[in-house]
From Swiss-Prot:
Encoding gene (name): rps15
Family listed: Belongs to the universal ribosomal protein uS15 family.
Organism: Cucumis sativus (Cucumber)
Record field: compositional bias (Polar residues): 1-11
An MF annotation (GO) of this entry: structural constituent of ribosome
Superkingdom of origin organism: Eukaryota
Protein name: Small ribosomal subunit protein uS15c
SMART domains according to UniProt: Ribosomal_S15 (SM01387)
Chain segments carrying region Disordered: 1-20
Main location: plastid
Assigned keywords, A-Z: Chloroplast, Plastid, Ribonucleoprotein, Ribosomal protein
Pfam families (UniProt xref): Ribosomal_S15 (PF00312)
Length: 90
């Protein structure tokens, strides 16, 4: 499996004190998504991993939707830092 060199946006101190925040969860899901994507490039017929990827994508999308409704500025900063696209449904 190819390791993805994605540096975390949130520092180690913030992880320890605020591990349940929406931003931390989105960063965590983004790391998992990138890792699974690189895995699926090598193993195209791994359907169980494809299903897991779709589930994680849905969870991240729901969290981003929640964050955009609650605090638009934090949402914009987070998607810019993670270099992910903005949702079309907003």
């Amino acid at each position: 499996m190819v390791k993805n060199s994605f540096s975390s946006v949130i520092s180690q101190e913030e992880k320890k004190e605020n591990g349940g925040s929406v931003e931390f969860q989105v960063v965590s899901f983004t790391n998992k998504i990138r890792r699974l994507t690189s895995h699926l490039e090598l193993h195209k017929k791994d359907y169980l991993s494809q299903r897991g990827l779709r589930k994680i994508l849905g969870k991240r999308q729901r969290l981003l939707s929640y964050l955009s409704k609650k605090n638009k500025m934090r949402y914009k900063e987070l998607i810019n830092q993670l270099d992910i696209r903005e949702s079309k449904t907003q």
